[in-house]
Amino acid sequence: MTIKNKGLIIILSSPSGTGKSSLAKALLKIDNNLRLSISATTRKPRLGEVEGINYYFKTKLEFEELVKQNKFLEYAKIYDNYYGTPKEYVEMLLNQGLDVLFDIDWQGAKSIKKNATNVVAIFILPPSIEILEQRLRNRATDNEEAIKLRMQSAQNEMSHANEYDYVITNDDFDQTLKKIHEIIVAEREKAF
C-alpha cells in the first residue's frame, strides 16, 4: 500500500551520536507544521520515557502480531529489539496537512521511500569518525562493547548516505539546524 498525503514525510537518519535526536527536537520547536512520528518498540522504556509520547512500548508478541496485520509503514530489528512506525498515526497527521518527522535508520528510510509519496530524506554525518567515537564515549551510557558495536553500525549506516536526497555534516549544531529547516521549507514549496 502506498501512502499518499497532503503533508511531507521528512526523514532524518544518521549514526548514533551524530545529533539526530537533538536536531529533531530543535526542529519541532521552530516549525509549527512538523510533528514527530512516534515509533513502536519492543525495548524497555528508559527513565523518563512516556508511553504514547516517546514510543509505543510493545511486547515481542504484540509487535509481531501488528506486523502480521500490516499495521506498520516500516519496521526493523535493531540491537535485538524491534522498532516500527504505525501507519494509522502517520496517515492521520499527513491528512491534516502536517509534515511528519522521522528519526529512523537507513532500513526504515528505504522502506518509507518505497511505500509513501512526498518523502524528503536527509542524512546527517559526523564531522569525523574520531569525533563520533568521542561523542559516544562522552555520553557515558554505553560500555566498551556497546561503543564498538555502535561504531561498526555507524560505518554501515554511513555507507547508505548516498541513498538520501540530502547529506549534511553536523559540525556546528545551529548551522546544521538552519540548513535542515531551509531544506524543509524549500521542499514544501516544491511539493505544493
Curated annotation (Swiss-Prot):
It catalyses: GMP + ATP = GDP + ADP. One of its GO terms (molecular function) is ATP binding. The keyword 4Fe-4S does not apply. It comes from the Bacteria. GO terms for cellular component: cytosol. PROSITE patterns: GUANYLATE_KINASE_1, GUANYLATE_KINASE_2. Keywords: ATP-binding, Cytoplasm, Kinase, Nucleotide-binding, Transferase. HAMAP family: Guanylate_kinase. This is Guanylate kinase. It comes from Rickettsia felis (strain ATCC VR-1525 / URRWXCal2) (Rickettsia azadi). The lineage of its organism: Bacteria, Pseudomonadati, Pseudomonadota, Alphaproteobacteria, Rickettsiales.
